[in-house]
A protein has these predicted regions:
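Glycine-rich, charged/polar anion/phosphate-binding loops
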Residues: 1, 11-18, 34-37
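Flexible, acidic loop-helix segments that line cofactor/substrate-binding pockets
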Residues: 1-13, 42-47
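Conserved C-terminal structural/oligomerization subdomain of aldehyde/semialdehyde dehydrogenase
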Residues: 20-149
Length: 149
């Protein structure tokens, strides 16, 4: 099985309808529990669906994340209040974009730290770029924590 390209860029209600569900047209995100080898975990989706994989510990969660990331070193995300867990995941996955407590788009400057940018992330390029240099800059983003005001 694989993720259907027909659903790339479609809104959540289109995906829900295809799954036999009826949701409000303004639904922004679908989520469901699945196993670690499901295509929604293994493949890039580019659609509003969040697969949830149940694990017994943060260590197992990091291990499963590492497997799903396939050593592309592109993007990883964690939601946690424990900075040590965030640090352990950052070190294990070593991705160009690492977002803590926010959506993946925060790593590109949408709702997170830094300027709006595009990612030419590994393995296809050099990560977050800017118009002046178009070279790789590593960004580490944390949302809603460590505020100084």
């Amino acid at each position: 099985a694989s993720v259907s390209k027909d659903f790339i860029g479609k809104d959540a209600s289109v995906l829900a309808r295809a799954a036999g569900l009826d949701v409000k047209p303004d639904t922004q995100l679908l989520f469901a529990e699945t196993d670690a080898k499901h295509p929604f975990v293994e493949e890039e989706q580019m659609m509003p669906f969040l697969p949830i994989v149940r694990v017994r510990s943060v260590e197992e969660g990091i291990e499963r994340s590492l497997e799903a990331e396939h050593e592309y070193r592109h993007t990883s995300i964690i939601h946690s209040h424990d900075v040590e867990n965030m640090t352990a995941m950052a070190r294990a996955l070593d991705t160009t974009l690492f977002i803590k407590n926010g959506p993946c788009m925060a790593g590109l400057g949408l709702g997170g730290e830094g300027y709006l940018s595009y990612s030419i992330a590994t393995p296809t390029g050099e990560g977050v770029t800017n118009p002046k240099t178009f070279t790789r800059v590593r960004r580490c983003v944390m949302v809603d924590n460590l505020r100084i005001y």
